[in-house]
């Protein structure tokens, strides 16, 4: 009895509306295409248990950050997040938030929120993640299934691997 599931890599849907919104906010994302939700849903019964959709998250977060600075132009000169804005403007072809968030990497890595400007920016990052993932959790029929996932600590998982389980 071996239990396993397959992972669908590179399976982002790349929502066109988000790409269009990024470009309307000054981005320059070209030739961005994804896999349709219907195709991904058709793969689930074939043993797919994890669908990697990181590109969708990156797009939604980048769009939200661009929108934040468009709606709050005074934040462009913020001591703590102004450099994030400058990177967004300098790297118009990028959509990976890691390219823009380097000035506040302590926040990204450790959750350190030094001021209200960083807190406000992180709020729109969180909303982008929830928008991208929330939609797909519902579409893939996974809503309400989190309690079914067995919780295991890193140490417990390491022990399982040592035992070959």
Label every PLM stretch briefly:
Residues 1-60:
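Catalytic alpha/beta core domains of metabolic enzymes, predominantly
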Residues 39-165:
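C-terminal alpha-helical cap/extension of soluble enzyme domains
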């Amino acid at each position: 009895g071996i239990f396993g599931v397959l992972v669908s890599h590179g399976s982002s849907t790349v929502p066109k509306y988000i790409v269009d919104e990024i470009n309307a906010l000054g981005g320059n994302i070209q030739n961005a295409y994804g896999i349709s939700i219907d195709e991904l849903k058709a793969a689930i019964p074939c043993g797919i248990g994890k669908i990697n959709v990181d590109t969708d998250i990156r797009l939604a977060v980048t769009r939200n950050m661009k929108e934040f600075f468009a709606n709050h132009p005074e934040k462009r000169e913020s001591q703590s997040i102004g450099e994030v804005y400058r990177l967004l403007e300098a790297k118009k072809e990028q959509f990976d938030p890691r390219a823009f968030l380097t000035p506040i990497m302590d926040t990204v890595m450790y959750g350190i929120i030094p001021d209200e400007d960083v807190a406000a920016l992180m709020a729109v990052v969180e909303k982008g993640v929830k928008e991208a993932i929330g939609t797909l959790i519902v579409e893939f029929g996974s809503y309400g299934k989190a309690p079914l996932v067995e919780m295991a600590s890193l140490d417990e998982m390491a022990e399982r691997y040592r035992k070959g389980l």
